[in-house]
Amino acid sequence: MNIRDLEYLVALSEYKHFRRAADSCNVSQPTLSGQIRKLEDELGIILLERTSRKVLFTQSGMLLVDQARTVLREVKLLKEMASNQGKEMTGPLHIGLIPTVGPYLLPYIVPMLKAAFPDLEVFLYEAQTHQLLEQLETGRLDCAIVATVPETEAFIEVPIFNEKMLLAVSEHHPWAQESKLPMNQLNGQEMLMLDDGHCLRNQALDYCFTAGAKENSHFQATSLETLRNMVAANAGITFMPELAVLNEGTRKGVKYIPCYSPEPSRTIALVYRPGSPLRNRYERVASAVSDEVKSILDGLK
């Protein structure tokens, strides 16, 4: 048994498909399948129930996968400790971002990170929160920029900024001329929402339900841009995060209205694994991103 075998096993548990797991490990499917069988022979247990349709792990297999994840995390920590000797801001940095933040934050922070930390080789990944946290847990990501939710409490959270949510309405909507609105005005309104898996959906719904609004049950969007286009078509109203509204003031068809009592918002944070020897690296990146966002938002006031 070696570290590579454990990586094959964990990849198979994530993809539940031999070819996709092999592709993720940059090996052929026969190689991965053969190593899994050798691992079973070495341990004297059956790890998988192999069917023509899907891969199922036995109870023993699931226990071994959990332990393999732990071993791989510790191996990554050892490598980080070795590479961290005098090279805190040097080397690869794998950052994940959620889809409701990434497209609007990256154009600002990518050039900033290159200028501030020229020796960092930054790799960027976009996925929903639960996927990012899984990859963070397994060590595939070093850190992630997400909206704080209960699931992020298992990690170290470094708040970057507090992001307002603005009410987006069609320019033909009766509220289009309002400069601001109290949240109780939403009582009885139907709101367009993102589909399941987006943390913004749950955060927006909490504010909506408290105000007496409800979700439009006939439509769910996969992206903020779809929501924006639906609003422009006067097909409904929704909440949009502040960064997604930057430079959108001149777009025809949509008006953005601040709300109050309470002001809807969410906290965007950089999260990383507890115990990481590269803590200072992540804290410095978080601080730099926070300063950049603050300067952007202050410039709009």
Swiss-Prot record:
Q: Which GO terms describe its biological process?
A: regulation of DNA-templated transcription
Q: Which SUPFAM superfamilies match?
A: Periplasmic binding protein-like II, Winged helix' DNA-binding domain
Domain HTH lysR-type: where?
1-58
Ranges annotated as DNA-binding = 18-37
Keywords from UniProt, A to Z, are: Activator, DNA-binding, Transcription, Transcription regulation
Q: Which GO terms describe its molecular function?
A: DNA binding; DNA-binding transcription factor activity
Keyword check for Lyase, yes or no.
no
Instruction: Indicate yes or no for the key word Transcription.
Output: yes
List the GO terms this entry assigns under cellular component, sorted alphabetically.
protein-DNA complex
The record's CDD domains line, in alphabetical order, gives: PBP2_OxyR (cd08411)
What does the UniProt record say this protein does?
Required for the induction of a regulon of hydrogen peroxide inducible genes such as catalase and glutathione-reductase.
Q: Which PANTHER family match?
A: HYDROGEN PEROXIDE-INDUCIBLE GENES ACTIVATOR, TRANSCRIPTIONAL DUAL REGULATOR HCAR-RELATED
* NCBIfam families linked to this entry: PRK11151.1
Report the family membership. Answer: Belongs to the LysR transcriptional regulatory family.
Protein known as: Hydrogen peroxide-inducible genes activator
Gene coding for it: oxyR
